[in-house]
């Protein structure tokens, strides 16, 4: 790649805009969901984003994700980041799916009609999609197996590994 650090950063910011409907920051503990100016009520799609991000907030409270991230940052070693984020996203997707799965036909149609058509303004290199594939496609497959074999408690146990056993016991992306 022949991009400067600033160009890579700009691409990363654009990727975040293209790919994310909301976010929860592990460090500042702020949940962000973009809404329209003067919007008074969240639609069902936006509510589903809040459900997903609230799971991340709970993960932060229970699994010490801020300390986990700060320790990796201090060590300048993010070996365990992709594996744990895959499990975190899988758990949030699972809970969000349970919530949206409770919709009746009317709410499901309403929800589907409210999903925004998000497009990127730039062409992104294919390697930008590798972590997203792990977090949002491979992680949920693993989480379904964990939940099938040990319910949500088993997935929580996997996420508690940092709190209970330390950084170097966490799964890497290769293990996921």
Residue ranges and their predicted role:
Residues 62-117:
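Post-HExxH zinc-binding segment in Zn-dependent metallohydrolases
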Residues 31-51, 80-84:
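Short pre-active-site segment immediately N-terminal to the catalytic Zn-binding motif
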Residues 49, 53-61, 90:
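Catalytic glutamate of the conserved HExxH
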Residues 21-32, 58-70, 112-122:
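Active-site-adjacent bridging/hinge elements
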Residues 48, 90-94, 140-145:
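Solvent-exposed, polar/charged alpha-helical surfaces in well-ordered, non-transmembrane soluble domains
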């Amino acid at each position: 790649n022949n991009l400067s650090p600033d160009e890579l950063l700009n691409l990363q910011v654009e990727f975040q805009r293209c790919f994310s409907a909301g976010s929860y920051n592990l460090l500042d503990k702020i949940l962000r969901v973009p809404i329209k100016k003067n919007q008074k009520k969240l639609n069902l799609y936006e509510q589903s984003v809040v459900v997903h991000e609230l799971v991340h907030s709970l993960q932060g409270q229970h699994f010490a994700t801020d300390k986990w991230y700060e320790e990796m940052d201090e060590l300048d070693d993010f070996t365990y980041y992709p594996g744990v984020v895959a499990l975190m996203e899988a758990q949030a997707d699972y809970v969000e799916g349970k919530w949206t799965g409770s919709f009746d036909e009317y709410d499901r149609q309403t929800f589907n009609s409210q999903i925004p058509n998000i497009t990127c303004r730039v062409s992104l290199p294919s390697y930008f999609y590798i972590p997203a594939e792990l977090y949002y496609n491979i992680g949920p497959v693993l989480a379904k197996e964990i939940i099938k074999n040990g319910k949500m408690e088993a997935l929580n146990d996997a996420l508690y590994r940092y709190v209970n056993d330390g950084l170097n016991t966490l799964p890497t992306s290769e293990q996921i």
